[in-house]
């Protein structure tokens, strides 16, 4: 089962984290992070005998990314939730992981300031000298949802042409 929902109010997304509103922070956390925990709880009875829960993260969870603002701490909480949920759901045979794509030209990403420059920089700097495609992300998600990944849980997997190793 795939969780791919994220949101932060524009006023809080583009500003400093310290200046984010309490309401905006809570809303971003509820929609982008807590919704995954709720999904895990509701999906568990449907996954008798095991299964796979996936969520989508981003490098901004582990490193400061310009113009990513409030979503960085929210995605960090999401990745931490993956580890806790993996521990809780593991005894039922349910694997829990996050997929962290590199920059993708999507409608959601268009809300990030200077995103076109981020795309160009990522393609130039990534060890494979290219951006990832939606098909690349889909292939990893397909693998993670399959029994071929039966021994993988609690992980964040990067599909970003190596961009995350640059620090």
Segments the model singles out, each with a brief description of its role:
Residues 6-44, 49-91, 103-105, 163:
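Catalytic loop of short-chain dehydrogenase/reductase
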Residues 95-105, 145, 158-160:
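Conserved SDR Rossmann-fold cofactor-binding beta-strand/turn motif
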Residues 2, 6, 54, 141, ...:
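N-terminal Rossmann-like NAD(P) cofactor-binding module of classical short-chain dehydrogenase/reductase
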Residues 141-142, 153-167:
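Short C-terminal tail/terminal secondary-structure segment
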Residues 40, 82-83, 138-141, 145:
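Short-chain dehydrogenase/reductase
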Residues 90, 95, 152-154:
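Short, small/polar-rich loop/turn modules that mediate ligand/substrate recognition or access, typified
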Residues 67-70, 91, 101-126, 166-167:
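A glycine/serine/threonine-rich, flexible loop-to-helix segment
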Residues 126-137, 148:
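A conserved structural motif in NAD(P)-dependent oxidoreductases
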């Amino acid at each position: 089962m795939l969780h791919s929902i994220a949101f932060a109010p524009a006023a809080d997304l583009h500003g400093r984290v310290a200046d984010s509103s309490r309401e905006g922070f809570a809303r971003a956390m509820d929609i982008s992070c807590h919704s995954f925990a709720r999904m895990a709880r509701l999906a568990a009875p449907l996954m008798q005998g095991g299964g796979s829960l996936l969520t989508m993260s981003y490098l901004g969870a582990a490193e400061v990314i310009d113009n990513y603002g409030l979503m960085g701490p929210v995605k960090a909480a999401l990745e931490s939730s993956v580890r806790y949920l993996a521990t809780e759901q593991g005894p039922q045979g349910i694997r829990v992981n996050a997929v962290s794509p590199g920059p993708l030209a999507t409608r959601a990403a268009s809300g990030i300031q200077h995103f076109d420059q981020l795309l160009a920089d990522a393609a130039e700097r990534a060890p494979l000298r290219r951006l990832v495609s939606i098909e690349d992300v889909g292939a990893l998600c397909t693998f993670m949802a399959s029994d071929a990944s039966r021994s993988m849980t609690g992980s964040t997997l990067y599909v970003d042409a190596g961009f995350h190793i640059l620090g």
